[in-house]
Every structure is written in C-alpha cells, then in structure tokens.
C-alpha cells in the first residue's frame, strides 16, 4: 500500500461529510451494509459495531449459506437486491460499498434503492464509475481517489468508523 496515497486520500475527506454521515446514521434504526470481498468484511465489521456501540439494527450479507442460496436462486447480480427486499423496512438505510464502483450486484442494489430506501455509497478508482453515478440519488456519497484496493478499502472503513 502506498502510504503517501493513503495520507492524500485521508486529507481529501471533508469534515462536513463526516458530520453529515454521523447525523444520518444516528437518525436511522436499521442499517444494511453491503459489499463484496474486502468490502464485505468491512460491511460485517461495521454492522456489528453499529449494533454494539450505537444500538442500531446493523445487518450485512455475509452468512455463506444464505449468500450462496441467494446467488443460486436469484443470480449474483440480483442477490443483494433480494436481500434488501427481504430485510429492509421503509426507513432502512442501505450503505453500498464497492472499491471499483463497478460491481454489478452493488450497482443493481443502488438502482433498486432509488425511490425505496435511503442510501449512502462509497466507491473508488475512476470517479465516473457506475456506482458513483447514483451519488445524486443518495443521501451521501464518498469517492476515494485511488486505484489501490488497500487504500480505498482502508479509507472506506475509516469513514464508516468515524462516528464511533
């Protein structure tokens, strides 16, 4: 991981956005956090921290049995949409994380949430990634200006941990 890149990306985070994130998270009772790979690990970690430290109903989609069932029955591209459909309530906040911003299942989840659920999106790599195109339809959007997975994932976790 390039430490200079990490420092630069940390400095790019706006304090006002972290304050807005805190306000949004504290105003919600149920929060679903979704990601793939390393972002899924972040989702699981943050969901349990929001439950333990903040008393929120934090959910991630990381149970292997349920995840593979949904992927088999609905296809990987729609599995997360179905998870949201089955577990979200009208006022549920959905946080979508994709380092590249181009994971079809995460992008499809953003499309699904439009007009149904409030969402926060976190992405990286190319600013014109597919997920970032939903930033105007989300309550808040964080884009990390790096093409390194380690940097993007670290910044995403720092952002989501910032209100703890």
Residue ranges of model-derived segments:
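Helix-enriched interaction subdomains in cytosolic or periplasmic regions
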Residues: 1-10
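A short, well-structured juxtamembrane/interface segment
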Residues: 9-28
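Short secondary-structure boundary micro-motifs
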Residues: 7-8, 15-16, 33, 70
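Residue-level detector of alpha-helical secondary structure
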Residues: 5, 20-24, 42-49
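Glycine-rich phosphate-binding loops that contact phosphosugars or nucleotide phosphates
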Residues: 33-164
């Amino acid at each position: 991981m390039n430490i200079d890149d990490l420092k630069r990306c940390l400095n790019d985070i706006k304090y006002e956005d972290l304050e807005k994130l805190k306000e949004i998270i504290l105003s919600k009772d149920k929060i679903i956090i979704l990601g793939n790979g390393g972002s899924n690990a972040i989702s699981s970690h943050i969901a349990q921290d929001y439950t333990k430290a903040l008393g929120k109903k934090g959910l991630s989609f990381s149970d292997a049995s349920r995840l593979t069932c949904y992927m088999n029955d609905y296809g990987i591209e729609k599995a997360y949409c179905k998870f949201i459909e089955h577990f979200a309530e009208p006022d549920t906040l959905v946080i979508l994380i994709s380092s590249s911003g181009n994971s079809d299942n995460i992008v499809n989840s953003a499309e699904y949430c439009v007009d149904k659920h409030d969402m926060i999106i976190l992405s990286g790599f190319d600013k014109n990634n597919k997920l970032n195109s939903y930033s105007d339809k989300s309550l808040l959007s964080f884009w990390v200006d790096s093409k390194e997975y380690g940097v993007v994932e670290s910044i995403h976790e720092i952002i989501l941990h910032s209100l703890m």
